Amino acid sequence: MSQKVLPTKINLIQFRRQLRLITVIKRLLENKREVLLLYLRTYASEYEKIYNEVNEEMKKVYESYLQAVASEGISNIEEIALSQKPSLEVSSSIKVIFGVKVPTIKLDKSTIPSKPFSDVETSPYLSESYEEMTEAFNKIIELVELESTIRSLVSELRKTQRLINSIDNYILPFYRGSIKFIKQILEDRQREEFSRLKIIRRILQRRRESGSG
């Protein structure tokens, strides 16, 4: 590829400047990669923490629910569930983390359905299951937001790594090879010119010597 480069001093200067610029860009990309990894480690740790909390809360929800089913009967529970229309709403927006757009998700608490049964007429386990599930909603939303954030950061990290790989595997070798090629041609020309001048000096010297004789 470097054989197609025109071997001139101007090109040598330009290629050296571009090589320095590309080296700076690579360093900036490597710094970005390190920061993204730091963010990812932080969010992954937070995700694991919230995930475990949600797991524990959902276990309590299911335990209460199963006890309610045993007490009320599955048909009564299903009848209560089917009487309710889907009402939960969330809002989303975008925030920027180190140049990466990530989602923020908020649960509209006013859309959480009110308890569709009487505490007096139904099993206390059903009420307990409802309250525990209501408390778990915010954690679940937080978990979804963290997962989306991690996905966005991983995607940006992969793009950054691809750019670094491209610089390492293609761009830097091209410029280094081109600079080496131009330098070699210019040095060869310089040696040829020096040899030519030496020959001319000898010829002129001989002529002077012949003329003086």
UniProtKB/Swiss-Prot annotation:
Protein purpose: Component of the A-type ATP synthase that produces ATP from ADP in the presence of a proton gradient across the membrane.
GO molecular function: ATP binding; proton-transporting ATP synthase activity, rotational mechanism; proton-transporting ATPase activity, rotational mechanism
Protein name: A-type ATP synthase subunit D
GO BP annotations, alphabetical order: proton motive force-driven plasma membrane ATP synthesis
Any one annotated GO CC term: plasma membrane
Record's keyword annotation contains Cell membrane: yes
Keyword Acyltransferase: no
Family membership: Belongs to the V-ATPase D subunit family.
Membrane topology of this protein: Peripheral membrane protein
UniProt KW keywords: ATP synthesis, Cell membrane, Hydrogen ion transport, Ion transport, Membrane, Transport
Pfam families for this protein: ATP-synt_D
Complex formation: Has multiple subunits with at least A(3), B(3), C, D, E, F, H, I and proteolipid K(x).
Protein localization: Cell membrane
Designated gene of the protein: atpD
